[in-house]
Amino acid sequence: NTVEIDGDKYNFYFEKSGGNKGAGLTGEKDDKYYQSGKLIKAGSDDKYQVVKVNTYAKNSDLDETLAEGEDITAYDKLDDVDAFLKDLDENGIAYYTKTDLEGMTDAAAKKILSDANINKKLADLKEVYIPKTELSTKEYFLVGTSGKVVDSKSRNKDGNDYYYVVEKAGKVGNIVAIYTEK
């Protein structure tokens, strides 16, 4: 269902049957993710956005609404590359930067770039960020303006000229690097 509010269109998905009939879906349906029924998609200016998956454990305030051992999942769009890097920092996820790569031998830097599916020379990159460990697709994924999850091997340029390098990892692509060219 599409709803227009103040000239902006929002897509929603509501459960069609069962005990949750009419409730907004939180989760995946047809390669798209929804939060409380609202489609999660990148803004038209952004082109692509990283979505962070947050899981919250059951607590005393939710005892009546959640079954034993059930968690709540929420999807948060990160505004831009800076917000994504800040989130990685806050969660202790280390990544290589251009400065790190420049401090290595040419062969070592070239291998890291190649492993991250970046076929550019380091000198041609303005910025580069490559997680040192594989990011879990259960924690981060990339969506386009249609809301479709980027799930194939690709390089996806956002509205700020950053490329998100994605590798196929099941239903959700794994973000393996971010870079921008000079």
Regions found by a protein language model. Give the residues of each.
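Extracellular adhesion/carbohydrate-binding repeat motifs centered on closely spaced tryptophans
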Residues: 1-182
